Structures are given as C-alpha cells and as structure tokens.
Amino acid sequence: MLTMGTALSQQVDANWQTYIMIAVYFLILIVIGFYGYKQATGNLSEYMLGGRSIGPYITALSAGASDMSGWMIMGLPGSVYSTGLSAMWITIGLTLGAYINYFVVAPRLRVYTELAGDAITLPDFFKNRLNDKNNVLKIISGLIIVVFFTLYTHSGFVSGGKLFESAFGLDYHFGLILVAFIVIFYTFFGGYLAVSITDFFQGVIMLIAMVMVPIVAMMNLNGWGTFHDVAAMKPTNLNLFKGLSFIGIISLFSWGLGYFGQPHIIIRFMSIKSHKMLPKARRLGISWMAVGLLGAVAVGLTGIAFVPAYHIKLEDPETLFIVMSQVLFHPLVGGFLLAAILAAIMSTISSQLLVTSSSLTEDFYKLIRGEEKAKTHQKEFVMIGRLSVLVVAIVAIAIAWNPNDTILNLVGNAWAGFGASFSPLVLFALYWKGLTRAGAVSGMVSGALVVIVWIAWIKPLAHINEIFGLYEIIPGFIVSVIVTYVVSKLTKKPGAFVETDLNKVRDIVREK
C-alpha cells in the first residue's frame, strides 16, 4: 500500500521532473516579483493598491485565488472524501456570498474609498467615512486585521508545510520555510502589482488542476460509472443531508456572510480601474469559483473509489489531491498539479501579508509619523510596508511551527472573525447615513469578541446542545448588527456631509 510519507515520497523522489516543474513555478513567481519591483514608483498607494489601475480579469482571478487558498484544493476534497456531498453546503454558501458581494459591496466600495480621502485600507476608509479624528476606529479595526490575519496567514503556511511533507516526504519545517521564502520575496519587493499578477497566474493553474484531476481519475476508474461505484461503497456519501442537522446546514451555508468583510478580497474591488469594469470581473470570477469548487467536490467523490482501487492507505484526507495527482499523472504533470496546490496556498498568503502590512503602515506607522510625513516621505513608508511583510510572516511562521488543527478549522476561525467584525460595518458604511463612530466601534468590537468567546467557551458545549455548535460567524454577525444599529441610534447623528457623499456614491455607481 502507498502511504503518504513512505512509498509515495519514494515515487516522487525518483521523478526529478516533478522537482523541475516546481522550480520553474517558483522561478516564474520570482520574475513576477522582480517585475513588480521595477514598476514600483516609491509611492505607498502604488505598493499597497497598485495605483487603482488593475483590470477586470486580473481583479477577478486574483480575488478568487486569494479567497480559495489551500482549502479548495486540500481542505474541501478531504471533507467531501470523509463526509460526502453534505460538505457542498459550504460551497453553495460561498458561491452565493461571493456573487452578492460583487453587487452589494464592490461598486460602492470602489467609488466610496476613492471619494473618502482616497483610502487604501479598510480602517482608513472607516476613519474617513465616519470622520474619526481621534483614530479610535482606525486603530481598533487595524488591530483586528493584524490579529486575525496573522492567524489566517499561519494556516496557509501550515498547508505549505503539509504539502512538502506529504508529497515529497520532506521535513514539514523545510516546506514551511521554502514556501515562506518565495511568498515573502515577491510580496516584499513587488507589492500589490506583483501579488495581483501572481494571483492571476495562480488562479489559472488552480482552475486547470481542478478540472484535470477528477476527469482523469474517472477515466482511469469507471468513467461516469465511478459515481455508481461510490454510491455502492458509501451510499450515504451522496446524500446532501448526511449527518447534518438544521444547525449544521445553516452553519455551513453561513460562510457566505463573511465575504462582505474579508479585507484581502474586497481590497481587489478597491484597486480595479473603474467600477464599470466590475460586471466583467464578476462574470469571470464567479464562473472560475463555481467550476473550481465543483472540481474540488468531484476530487473528493472520485477519491472514495480511487483510494481502494489503487490500494492506497490515506492517512490524512486533506492530502487526497496530492496522492491522486502523483499516482495518475506523468511526473511533469504531477509537478504542475503540485504547483497548483502551492498556487492556492501562496496566493492567499501573499494577499494577507500585504493587507496586514498595509494596515501596520497606513493605520499605525502613519499615526506615529503624521500625515505630512506620509506625503513627503513616501519611500520611507514603502520600506516600512516591506518590513511589515517580513515581520508578520515571521510571526505567522512561528505559530505554524507546531500545527495542531485542520486547515478548514484554522480558516474557519479567521473567516468568522472578519465576517462578524467587518461585514456588518462595511454594509452599514456603504448604505446607512445613520451610522456613527460609536456605533461602528461598538459593533465591530462586539462582533469580534462574540467570535472569540464562541470558539473558546461556547463551542465546547456542543455535546450538551447542538445550538452551541453553531458556526461562530452567525452569532457574531447578529450581535454586531444589533449593537451597531442600537448604539448609532443612541449617539449623536453624523454630519450632513455623510448623506451628501452617500448620494454621490449612489449616483456614480448608477452611471453606465
């Protein structure tokens, strides 16, 4: 039998072509990073947001690639392999959430962030939108980004380490350091432009991989009859409701709520050349997402028949895609498919590093140095941004050094944190003139705290009553909405300029 750390690694070791393909992939990323560095002007907005000059297709695939991460290629197939089609509820929720995000958030955010002092980060937008002269809102939202994104980034590093450990039998820590080095290099030097171009490139690779693997697997098994074989082996795995209560379905479906507040995703909307390009981005982005997620589900289902057919002992379901790519394909193609996993992992890490870096630079360092210094010392701020990338990466690597949770759980916790603290605030800021600074701060903090409390103390009580097992984004989101609204109603109304700006944003968005 093949096991993930022994026979399979020996097979890969014998095929040097696989290493060549991985090396070529890394080289391409380094070249793109160097290109981004050569295009840099020393302007902070250019480094952090690409000068708001990104086209619709790069916007679409970079948003998708940075969103899906290693979860789409490793986490989701593993979940479907283990539990069956019931895992599809999360894909339905995500696709619907992303689709709504393009309509509800994207156009207004692109217009409003430029109108509100040309904000290049979410905290900066919140500050300008709510006239936060004391920077309380900016500091708190910046802290939430730094804390949750460090957690989120470390999950990506865990995926990278797992990949090299599983596919090549290499030390987990070696894989962790290698992935970190490449990501840090092109993010550090190339900034937002390099990250966006690499994400587009990586998005293409991911899509090809998610289509190829299940199709070739079925061709090598029993064609479309593979699904009949799966039904015979594990009939309940084709049941959408297997092992799920109403609470379980709602929890999976509710992942879509998080889209409105994920900084590394909605920053893509802020950087597109014009809000008028967003429909093109939406069509490509949602199509890419739907095909990719369906491919991931297909990998998990075909894996149920594949593993026993090839006499494989699968110790970790999240390595299913790795096993299939190495057993089914020529080493060169297998190397390409491993590069697809790296693409999924690294595209998310780089985006998260850059957003965290921009928050540390724009939302904290600028407060120390002052607005005037920021205008006259742009190169200094770009360098601080680069150093912030390095610092955040080192902290995330340290946390990832001893992994003790599944990829899906790690991502789920961070996703809920942003979804509960930022999603309601983003929606209120874009649509409601009655939002106040006190309401924004209270809602944001309460949402984040509810998520933390739910994870730490409420979820462990799920064995007592299943309601306690509810995905933490739901109670966090609800509490944040209520607190934001109530506190805003009880505090001083914002100035008339808010209604004027909201009307202006609405009119611009309606322009054809």
Swiss-Prot record:
One Pfam family recorded for the sequence: SSF
Keywords: Amino-acid transport, Cell membrane, Ion transport, Membrane, Sodium, Sodium transport, Symport, Transmembrane, Transmembrane helix, Transport
Reactions the enzyme catalyzes: L-proline(in) + Na(+)(in) = L-proline(out) + Na(+)(out)
GO CC, alphabetical: plasma membrane
This protein's name: Sodium/proline symporter
InterPro entries assigned to the protein according to its UniProt record, in alphabetical order: Na/Glc_symporter_sf, Na/Pro_symporter, Na/solute_symporter, Sodium:Solute_Symporter
Function in brief: Catalyzes the sodium-dependent uptake of extracellular L-proline. Since most S.aureus strains are L-proline auxotrophs, this transporter may aid the bacterial persistence during an infection of tissues with low proline concentrations.
Alphabetical GO biological process terms: proline transport
Topology in the lipid bilayer: Multi-pass membrane protein
